[in-house]
Amino acid sequence: MHEHLKEKLAILPDQPGCYLMKDRQGTVIYVGKAKVLKNRVRSYFTGSHDGKTLRLVGEIVDFEYIVTSSNLEALILELNLIKKHDPKYNIQLKDDKTYPFIKITAEKQPRLLITRNVKKDKGKYFGPYPNAQSAHETKKLLDRMYPLRKCSNMPDKVCLYYHMGQCLAPCVKEVTEEQNKEIVDEIIKFLNGGHKEVRSELETKMYEASEKLEFERAKELRDQIAHIDAIMEKQKMIMSDLVDRDVFGYAVDKGWMCVQVFFVRKGKLIERDVSMFPIYDEPEEGFLTFIGQFYENSSHFKPKEIVVPGSIDSELVERFLEVEATQPKRGKKKDLVELANKNAKIALEEKFYLIERDEERTIKAVENLGKQLGIETPYRIEAFDNSNIQGTNPVSAMIAFIDGKPAKKEYRKYKIKTVQGPDDYESMREVVRRRYTRALKEGLPLPDLIIIDGGKGHLAAASDVLENELGLYIPMAGLVKDDKHKTSHLIIGDPPEPVMLERNSQEFYLLQRVQDEVHRFAITFHRQLHGKSVIQSALDDIPGIGDKRKKVLLKHFGSLKKMKEASIEEFVEAGMPKNVAETIYTYLTDKKTL
């Protein structure tokens, strides 16, 4: 641990507040809150942690904290700091999941619509519905029962809906505000849980029509009753008080938290939301952060009541969200919380089971690959690929897969130093020589299998260096691509012989992942270098710009395009003196062809 960290830990206050963990670049990588800052922040640097938390702690080189006057203030501040800094280790709920609502527009001649965007436009919104089908079925029923306007624009003549008795034709007839209000009130009553009353009224009208021998009308009313029954059958009542509430439950296992939310609307359980994320705080703290972000999401509306598990501070939730929050001790609400907790626990168990199965399949693929190639199981695979464009900025990349999974800390990038022009074979010789000379010198682990992204020439060049120069005899295979630049097969041996793998086998998928990953890593590195060289060459002729300032500009702007779009003030912000900023601006503005 850094000495300055020890000094800062020693003077932490025993008050509530927020803390910001920073990496060596000074970037905020995690924001947390605590009832007692001293205890919480120190806990990161003492005791044992799971691997995920160890990764976080391993990146921390500094921290700062903000003392607050209460836990509520700390919770509010934490959410604002997360939004401001977007730390990579914090959960960030996305606004990508929306639910459909039925809307009665506030137009002079109102309409019924399905929408996923709730606006402050004086319209009346009902929902959310669990899915689009449920919303459309309900709207279809309401369209049959209540003759509101259907057309988005007023036509010049009556449409089919008028002839079907489903519209009053405000396009050609006068429909008063009172008539519309009466219809809208009926729709609101239905959507607010009054469907039983509406059904009873329709039933009475049906019998009256039958007695008057109006059989067509009676049949129409009977069909409407049947539609109501069909829709309501799908939305069984679980609470008799018709209160809109969200019921929360959660579970924690192996450093992960799952939160399940049951949406209860008008007494019916209509939908649930499942969120799963890594957790670095105490479960209760993680849950409070989650619920704060949950209701900041534009698709989640605060109901009349929020129901939380017994371990959560419901008073804090209530003050923070300004909604009634309860912790039921018995009854149906307690049953729902326990059901949400149970579902969260099951979801986590499924997650870890699937991870375990995936690991089993991956290990099996590694073992089978060894058998197919006639070698020992290649638990460690290293793969190489070259990248250049017409010989410029030639680079190579090496990636490592351990137990069938990418080991990104083992990846290495190489600028080609000894080869002039686009010579793939000599580039492969150089990079293999550099990699394994260093491995021997530093006692680094050697791979069980080396994969060269290329054909016989690449394989021969790499094998020659490995065996004849370094005296290493490590199994080596070439990955051959087809005409579409996709993984085709392996070649191995001397002379190289093709090894055909079944395309739907796990070992083939493993090779595809290796090839795609090494290609991605190499080409990304090449593009970075190419971008830097373009910027640096573009800046070569500007007076007052040396290597140091080139690096500063490259780091600040990232691309020549952004530099050409920048103002003089932005160059000053990047650390350039005013006169140099003016020179750069003038030069780049004049050089339109750059």
Curated annotation (Swiss-Prot):
Known role: The UvrABC repair system catalyzes the recognition and processing of DNA lesions. UvrC both incises the 5' and 3' sides of the lesion. The N-terminal half is responsible for the 3' incision and the C-terminal half is responsible for the 5' incision.
Subunit structure: Interacts with UvrB in an incision complex.
Protein source organism: Bacillus anthracis
Protein name per UniProt: UvrABC system protein C
Domain spans labelled UVR: 196-231
Location of the protein in the cell: Cytoplasm
This protein's record includes keyword GTP-binding: no
GIY-YIG domain ranges (all copies): 14-91
GO biological process: nucleotide-excision repair; SOS response
Annotated NCBIfam families: PRK00558.1-5 (NF001824), uvrC (TIGR00194)
GO CC field: cytoplasm; excinuclease repair complex
Cross-referenced CDD domains: GIY-YIG_UvrC_Cho
Keyword DNA repair: yes
